[in-house]
């Protein structure tokens, strides 16, 4: 799929109007220039599209989310596929699709990064997961997330523990598991203090 081949630019939209306009124009130029990057060109070569005129439309949209300290992020983001080519169980219906879900900005749902993993959700059986044991679930879980740092004016990657220290949000209950005696479980209650938990 062509999704994720072109550059996405996140702006914090802070400062005076001249600064924000300048940042916006620079962002537009960076996205348009990304049509000449290696990923889009290789994709076009692989699909016999290299000799076609490359046209691009630009989408500018507001990031929906909340501020937590210096960070701004959506609680969850994802990418949905109309066909699931990663069916790890015979019960999964490939034609019903797949969602790759992450905590924070959706950049990690589009492109998997290093040893960090999105949550894979088959739409035919959303409770099924490819991991079975607690160590597997822990290994193949998201540990870092992308956020907008409003103080620095940039998108950056933060460790989940760094964010949880400034995030007082009852919905965090749905994004974490607590390990006790070799088992993973949701926190006991929504307001449980997770500091010091594994």
Where are these regions (language model features)?
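Conserved mixed alpha/beta core segments that line enzyme active sites in large multi-domain catalysts
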Residues: 1-198
